[in-house]
A protein has these predicted regions:
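Short, positively charged low-complexity motifs
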Residues: 4-5, 20, 24
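Acidic, His/Gly-rich catalytic cores of divalent-metal-dependent hydrolytic chemistry
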Residues: 219-291
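Active-site-proximal segments of metal-dependent phosphoesterases and phosphodiesterases across multiple
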Residues: 51, 130-139, 173-203
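Active-site-proximal beta-strand elements of phosphoester/diester hydrolases
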Residues: 54-62, 172-179, 226-230
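Active-site environment of divalent metal-dependent phosphoester hydrolases
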Residues: 62-67, 91-94, 115-121, 181-183, ...
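Active-site metal-binding loops of divalent metal-dependent hydrolases
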Residues: 59-61, 87-89, 108, 114-117, ...
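Core catalytic region of metal-dependent phosphoesterases/phosphodiesterases
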Residues: 54-149
Length: 291
């Protein structure tokens, strides 16, 4: 593990209280500040620092508790100053309820993913599916999975998901799930520079990060960085490991984390959710598979 080139003083609990900070249940992961300029729960730049040294973005967990716990262990080593989630928290895995509860306990700020939206607002899937009627069998499978996830989550968790914002802005970083205009559509890694700039240039930050497509990349485009964080679960790039984005002193990278895929496959087999066999095939191969 490479050493951090700049280290900031992490305040003691007493110092933090005197400055108006609240310590999270996971002291590695969050410092919140309360003052007249922030809303409850906002995460801000550390007081006394001009910039965050390290920012991590963890996206597309998809209810995969085994992969998520492995990523948390890696985050304890990389020790970011701020962690954001990129949405798609619950649907598509063995543990939707446990993932939502864990994210809330950690206090991570994040953005609305398309599967979060379809769980909280079922009509959003109908609206999007109507644009691609040729994929009607796929949308039917996804709706059956979503119905089971909604039942597992319950109304209160669904309401929380539905209130997630569509974007987060922190220092030089803008985070969206797919694109600034939609959590459902975004360019692919092979998109042209012009295409990426057209979508992400309007965010007005030097670094734009998104999730959604489960294929990580980092591109330099028109004086800014556009990156995909990769996915904690259901990788589509042939690498079964979990992935997340790390910005270290403005140097972006993708972290890959080994986890016990077989353990998660067993959890899927026993969860009772519809089409768990489909999800298992994607997890086992690290590539998208048709239902």
């Amino acid at each position: 593990m490479e050493a951090r080139s700049q280290l900031r003083h992490r305040p003691t609990h007493r110092e933090a209280q005197e400055l108006g900070f609240e310590r999270s249940v996971e002291p590695y992961f969050r410092w919140n500040v309360r003052d007249s300029q922030t809303r409850p729960g906002d995460i801000v730049l550390c007081r006394g620092c001009n910039n965050l040294v390290r920012i991590a973005i963890v996206s597309d967990i998809h209810g995969n508790r085994t992969a998520f716990e492995a990523v948390l262990a890696d985050l304890r080593q990389s020790s970011p100053d701020l962690i954001l989630h990129g949405g798609d928290l619950a649907d598509g895995g063995s543990s939707p309820r446990e993932i939502v509860d864990r994210i809330r306990d950690l206090g991570w700020q994040g953005v609305l993913g398309n599967t979060d939206e379809m769980l909280a607002r079922p009509e959003s899937l109908t609206e999007f599916a109507s644009q691609t009627p040729q994929l009607k069998p796929l949308w039917a499978v996804i709706e059956e999975m979503a119905a089971a996830s909604r039942e597992a989550l319950g109304e209160e968790r669904l309401a929380w998901l539905g209130k997630l914002p569509r974007a987060q802005m922190h220092g030089p970083v803008a985070l969206v799930h797919a694109s600034p205009d939609s959590p459902w559509r975004c360019p692919m890694p092979e998109a042209s520079d012009v295409g990426l700039e057209a979508v992400y240039g309007p965010v007005g930050r030097s670094i734009a990060v998104h999730g959604h497509i489960h294929r990580s990349y980092i591109r330099s485009v028109a004086g800014m960085v556009v990156a995909n964080s990769g996915s904690v679960s259901l990788s589509y790039d042939g690498d079964r490991r979990a992935a997340y984005f790390l910005l270290d002193d403005l140097q972006p990278s993708i972290r890959r984390v080994e986890y016990d895929v077989d353990k998660e496959l067993k959890a899927l087999a026993g969860c009772g959710f519809p089409h768990a066999d489909w999800i298992a095939r994607i997890l086992a191969s690290g590539r998208y598979q048709a239902p």
